[in-house]
């Protein structure tokens, strides 16, 4: 007998997993997965599936039934996180003049330049393959996963901030990147290919637009600093979005452009068996 399992169980605002109607499944189920649809990347969830080893012999007598059915869950999405640094070492001179910062303010996946950014797809639990992928129809705001802090102590003129705050990720060192995302926050995206495939074929199949400021402290100026605003698009390199792969990208922010460097592949945890009582 074959059992299938998946997680997460619940859905949120039409997001997550949709299971076929009871009685309509004759073979392995096909599950529809939709990414978080309220445009809140902080609510994105991982998606894992498993099936038991039907060829394995298990003692199903009453005395041993509490042991449950053994499953090995596997990640079927792609996981992305980002760290960032300035493209050059910025001046960190202390005092009245000279300190410069890159302030990352907002970010979004740019739908018009992201043909491989999917809002939904269908996973076949028989072989964990994807089909029926639907391209997103709008930009996807990921600002809520940025590790923003209030930098009003630096940018303190009302015209340069909103709601009496200046929220940004502050970058200073070219040698030491810092994480752009809040701890334990990730993007979970529908993959382009299996783990053994090639991933996306072209740079920019997924493109992220960043709004950022370059701020230089200068007490000789009326407001104590000079600020320039920038909006630039960063293209994920080819080879992204393999199923079950966790990527860590380093982004370089410059005066006129943003570059995403070759990613590192992170450990996404072991695919260790676990028991579920059925």
Language-model-detected regions and their locations in the chain:
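Short Pro-Gly-centered beta-turn/loop motif in secreted/extracellular proteins
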Residues: 1-2, 9, 180-205
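Short aromatic-acidic-glycine turn motif
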Residues: 110-128
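Predominantly extracellular/luminal regions of secreted and cell-surface proteins
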Residues: 109-113, 132-133, 137
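Short, low-hydrophobicity acidic/polar segments
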Residues: 1-114, 144-166, 170-173, 177-180, ...
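Generic recognition of long tandem-repeat/solenoid scaffolds
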Residues: 71, 142, 186-188
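Conserved small-residue
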Residues: 131, 139-145
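Exposed, polar/acidic Ser/Thr-rich sequence context and nearby capping/turn residues
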Residues: 88, 176, 194, 198-271, ...
């Amino acid at each position: 007998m074959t059992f299938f399992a998946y997680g997460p169980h619940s859905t949120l605002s039409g997001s997550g997993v949709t299971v076929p109607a009871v009685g309509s499944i004759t073979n392995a189920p096909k599950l529809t997965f939709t990414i978080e649809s309220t445009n809140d990347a902080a609510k994105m969830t991982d998606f894992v599936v498993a099936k038991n080893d039907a060829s394995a012999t298990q003692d199903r007598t009453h005395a041993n039934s509490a042991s449950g059915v053994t499953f090995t869950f596997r990640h079927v999405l792609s996981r992305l996180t980002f760290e960032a640094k300035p493209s050059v070492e910025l001046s960190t001179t202390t005092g009245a003049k000279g300190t410069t910062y890159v302030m990352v303010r907002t970010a979004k996946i740019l739908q018009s330049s992201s043909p491989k950014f999917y809002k939904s797809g269908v996973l076949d639990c028989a072989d964990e393959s994807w089909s029926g992928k639907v391209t997103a129809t709008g930009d996807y705001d990921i600002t809520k996963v940025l590790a923003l802090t209030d930098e009003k102590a630096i940018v303190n003129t009302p015209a340069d901030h909103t709601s009496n705050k200046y929220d940004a990720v502050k970058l200073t060192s070219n040698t030491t990147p810092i994480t752009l995302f809040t701890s334990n926050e990730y993007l979970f995206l529908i993959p382009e290919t299996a783990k053994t495939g090639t991933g996306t074929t072209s740079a920019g199949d997924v493109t992220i637009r960043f709004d950022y400021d370059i701020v230089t402290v200068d007490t000789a100026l009326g407001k104590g600093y000079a600020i320039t605003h920038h909006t630039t698009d960063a293209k994920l390199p080819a080879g992204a979005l393999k199923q079950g792969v966790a990527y860590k990208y380093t982004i370089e922010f410059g005066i006129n452009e943003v570059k995403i460097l070759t990613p590192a592949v992170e450990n996404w945890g072991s695919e260790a068996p676990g028991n579920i009582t059925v």
